[in-house]
């Protein structure tokens, strides 16, 4: 059922947006514009606002603490850390090519695992050897932290690498699993929801990381360079 207060807020926000656009401004400030709305109304209104701004050619600055909201509306997103701009980029690049460990851990979901650089684009980890699509300036043998997103881990019944399911969250089309490796390290993985694994079960997994993100481990210094 539709919450009446949320529906009233929806009408109010549409009216406020119409009034703000009436003078045909070149730049519009949107400060938490979708707060107090339920999930479905928030998603629908955010898409409508983006379409309206695009159609009118109006630039806007959106201030929000909601990542999903920022990604849905914005072409470029800035991530701030204690008042400092960490990265200004597209939503895609913020997720797949974070400029710092803070951005990597703040945007989306993911875990860092320790690894050793074997070559400019190859890392040895407890998950095996991972091949990347970029080169790093760190010397071979350097200790690095590898970011793995839930969509980087895929089920593989034939894999020698086994992980134990320690938690699960049903998302509808997919299920988010929390996995524990034999070393005790934990990762998250998204599997199709028709594969209904249970906590305590062992599953075969492998890494399928199209965008390998690597940072120098604490205590080492190196730069990251795209191929």
PLM regions: where:
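Helical segment within the ABC ATPase nucleotide-binding domain
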Residues: 42-56
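ABC-family nucleotide-binding domains
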Residues: 38
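Conserved signature/switch motifs of ABC ATPase nucleotide-binding domains
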Residues: 19, 23
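Internal alpha/beta loop-helix hairpins
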Residues: 54, 59, 64-128
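Catalytic Walker B motif of ABC-type/P-loop ATPase nucleotide-binding domains
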Residues: 28-32
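Non-catalytic connector elements of ABC transporters
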Residues: 110-112, 120-227
């Amino acid at each position: 059922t539709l919450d009446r207060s949320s529906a009233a807020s929806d009408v109010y926000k549409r009216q406020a947006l119409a009034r703000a656009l009436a003078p045909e401004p070149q730049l519009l400030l949107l400060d938490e514009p979708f707060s107090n709305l339920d999930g479905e109304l928030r998603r629908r209104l955010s898409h409508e606002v983006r379409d309206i701004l695009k159609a009118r050619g109006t630039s806007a600055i959106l201030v929000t603490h909601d990542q999903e909201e920022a990604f849905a509306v914005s072409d470029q997103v800035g991530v701030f850390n204690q008042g400092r701009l960490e990265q200004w980029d597209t939503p895609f690049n913020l997720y797949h090519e974070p400029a710092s460990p803070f951005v990597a851990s703040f945007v989306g979901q993911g875990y860092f695992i320790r690894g050793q650089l074997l070559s400019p684009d190859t890392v040895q980890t407890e998950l095996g050897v991972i091949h990347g699509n970029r080169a790093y300036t760190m010397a071979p043998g350097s200790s690095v932290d590898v970011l793995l997103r839930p969509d980087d881990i895929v089920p593989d019944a034939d894999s020698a690498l086994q992980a134990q399911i320690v938690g699960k969250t049903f998302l509808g089309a997919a299920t988010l699993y929390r996995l524990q490796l034999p070393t005790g390290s934990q990762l998250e993985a998204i599997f199709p929801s028709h594969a209904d694994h249970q906590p305590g079960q062992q599953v075969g997994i492998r890494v399928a990381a199209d965008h390998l993100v690597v940072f120098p481990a604490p205590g080492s210094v190196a730069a990251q360079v795209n191929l």
